[in-house]
């Protein structure tokens, strides 16, 4: 089994392991093709990545460059991420399978109140390989 892992995610606030989207695109270009599993901190754009912005509006906040590399070049069997914690009134946790690409996306980082006061409240995903 070939696995690629990364802690990086697009810049949002003052957190560790963040890079500008331009720098991240160059970084994602280095993901080797033929990986079975890609496990990264943040999701691809449009894949379990809905979140409330500062204006309390929903937006897709995943990385579009990462999505391009995953769907068109790397093509892993499984793509695992977290980082997007909102799941109040949103389906953001769990698994999403894209049959046209034969890729399963996973987000197991849900919290119920957007403030982490209840902690991680989603029990994760189990994937048989």
Predicted region positions:
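Hydrophobic/aromatic beta-strand patches that form the interior of the parallel beta-sheet core
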Residues: 4, 78-80, 104-106
